[in-house]
Structure formats: C-alpha cells, structure tokens
Amino acid sequence: MSLNEIGAKLKELRIKNNITQDELARNLYLSRQAVSRWETGKSIPDYQTLILICKFYNVNMNYF
C-alpha cells in the first residue's frame, strides 16, 4: 500500500468519525502537522502510532 493510500484511509477514518486533525493529534499526543503529513502522503505513522490509531478508531491493522 502506498503512502497516499494509507493517508487517504487515515483521513477517511477521521472524517467518518467527525474528528478534526487537532482532536486526533491531541488524543495521540502528537502534533496536528504530523496528522496532516500522514493524510497528504508525505509520511506514515510508525508502527506504535499505527497501533494507537487502530485502538482509537476501533479498527484492525488489516484496515491499512
């Protein structure tokens, strides 16, 4: 899966759950800029952060 595909899925989850980038960043103890970079395909979350994202949204890692 490409960076853009992962970013699109992250953004889709966030919007589907009616959460802003700021809210997600606060819940994950990260910056809003990090969330933005993921969603635009400029970077991807590390493995531990991806686990936190999955727990936050209650999705399986296979979603990505």
Model-derived features: positions:
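A short, Lys/Arg-rich alpha-helix, primarily the initiator
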Residues: 1-16
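Canonical J-domain
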Residues: 2-3, 18, 38-42
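Residue-level detection of the helix-turn-helix DNA-binding "recognition helix"
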Residues: 11, 15, 29, 40-42
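Short alpha-helical DNA-recognition segment
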Residues: 18-37, 52
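Residues in the helix-turn-helix
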Residues: 23, 34, 44, 60-63
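DNA major-groove recognition helix of helix-turn-helix/homeodomain DNA-binding modules
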Residues: 48-63
